[in-house]
């Protein structure tokens, strides 16, 4: 309907083009996910099926949007980092965030049975999303460090909380009151002395979250026998707060 008398309504649209030459982070979060996990009988404090499904949905997002150089996930959230030179949807914030969150949600629903089997999906989940800009490499590393530190803090608290509720028979309010004002050392001591749980021995995924990135792997051609290095998307549960990770995989932030 080009050049029609109604075309003026386009002038009401607000421009939302993101700044050039900065890292774009699209962070998605589950909306009312506590209710969703309760309705679908998620194990507490961590449900391996749910975490694996989140990782799978995020992996498919990374395949669909190759401008994503690294992604980090914990619980019901995922952060996708798009390279500085990304020109996806001409860097329109609303288009980028809505496309990524809708694709993530569709993959979550589509692949539900792969991870939950005959456990029925009673209603689809909802995720919100936003774009945040980070100008420097140090900023983006600090952002990812913040999310991984948050993973540890939340998981330590939840591990203690559910141990008190499920193993010690505390009510939710009693468990909250007992944990109020405690620090990491106290929580670790509680887990070990009262529940024989060594927090450091829990799966790394629970404590460190999930990192998706392109990792160099050696592949051998079956016909020629020649081996060459290729980059493949992998999901790992590693420390990204220390510089060791970034020194081992410098190409991640070199993808500008």
UniProtKB/Swiss-Prot annotation:
Highest taxon of the lineage: Eukaryota
UniProt record, GO biological process: tRNA 5'-end processing; tRNA modification; tRNA processing
Keyword tRNA processing set for record: yes
Annotated disulfide bonds: none
Chief place of localization: cytoplasm
Name of one Pfam family that matches: Thg1C
Compartments where found: Cytoplasm
Binding site for Mg(2+) 1: 29-30, 76
Cofactor-binding details, from the entry: Binds 2 magnesium ions per subunit.
Positions with a binding annotation for GTP: 29-34, 75-76
Key words, A-Z: Cytoplasm, GTP-binding, Magnesium, Metal-binding, Nucleotide-binding, Nucleotidyltransferase, Transferase, tRNA processing
Similarity-based family: Belongs to the tRNA(His) guanylyltransferase family.
PANTHER family: TRNA(HIS) GUANYLYLTRANSFERASE-RELATED (PTHR12729:SF6)
Name of the protein described by the UniProt record: Probable tRNA(His) guanylyltransferase
Originating species: Dictyostelium discoideum (Social amoeba)
